[in-house]
């Protein structure tokens, strides 16, 4: 993949469906390689709550605060936006984690989405890399989130998961034509197939696509054909 020139700072958009494993991808496999801060509204909100020790569950009030307090969720999201604004103003390198599900058609026929952020970053001189973790279907997203909740993790309403899934796919499909480079991973399969790279592109040229390298599993093509259709 083409790397950013010294004159261009790096900005990484880490995105994926709820339960896709994007946080794990970053913290277990990528953080020590890139060595840059990851801006994440959920983690910022968690930093305001009591620390969890071992398998001990949070008290009920803390779980409600994390999962249901829309006021503080909004404060956390706006705080991350403020941090990002400052980072961009100072030309600091950073990564930003998001479900990337914002896709809102406007009355003037434009669409409000995170692609606006990508265009802003590129206009500010950043080399923008999109990392996306895909899942075969929304049922897998729902199942992963339920497992996470059972283990004491963050809850997301089923309705939101169902609404977000196709919007994320649509937004990523459009973003691929805007970013400088992108790597798409599949995380639909078993443990030994975790984070399979399935599509790599840079400067609007496809460098690798698993569909051209063989016969990928149907779980992969189920979403990859939607997000990055081959012409």
Language-model features: locations:
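Phosphate-binding P-loop
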Residues: 2-8, 87-88
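Short hydrophobic/aromatic beta-strand immediately N-terminal to the Walker A/P-loop
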Residues: 11-13
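P-loop (Walker A) phosphate-binding loop of NTP-binding proteins
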Residues: 17
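Conserved glycine(s) of the Walker
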Residues: 21
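Hydrophobic positions on the alpha1 helix immediately C-terminal to the Walker A/P-loop
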Residues: 25
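Conserved nucleotide-sensing/catalytic segment adjacent to the nucleotide-binding pocket
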Residues: 36-110
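ATP-dependent NMP and nucleoside kinases share a basic, alpha-helical "lid"
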Residues: 99-151
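Conserved GTP-binding G-domain of TRAFAC-class P-loop NTPases and closely related GTPase folds
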Residues: 140-231
């Amino acid at each position: 993949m083409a790397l950013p020139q010294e004159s261009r700072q790096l900005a990484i958009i880490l995105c994926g469906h709820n339960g896709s494993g994007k946080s794990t991808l970053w913290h277990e496999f990528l953080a020590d390689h890139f060595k840059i801060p990851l801006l994440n509204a959920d983690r910022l909100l968690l930093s305001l709550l009591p620390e969890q020790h071992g398998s001990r569950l949070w008290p009920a009030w803390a779980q409600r605060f994390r999962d249901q307090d829309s006021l503080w969720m909004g404060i956390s999201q706006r705080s991350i936006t403020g941090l990002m604004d400052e980072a961009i103003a100072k030309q600091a390198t950073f990564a930003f984690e998001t479900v990337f599900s914002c896709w809102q058609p406007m009355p003037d026929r434009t669409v409000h989405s995170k692609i606006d952020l990508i265009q802003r970053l590129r206009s500010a001189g950043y080399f923008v890399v999109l990392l996306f973790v895909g899942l075969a279907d929304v049922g897998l997203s729902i199942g992963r989130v339920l497992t996470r909740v059972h283990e004491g993790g963050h809850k997301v309403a089923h309705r939101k998961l169902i609404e977000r899934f196709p919007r994320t796919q649509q937004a990523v499909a459009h973003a691929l034509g805007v970013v400088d480079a992108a790597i798409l991973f599949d995380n639909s399969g078993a443990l030994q197939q975790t984070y399979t790279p399935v599509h790599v592109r840079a400067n609007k040229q496809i460098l690798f696509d698993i569909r051209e390298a063989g016969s990928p599993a149907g779980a992969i093509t189920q979403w990859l054909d939607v997000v990055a259709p081959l012409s």
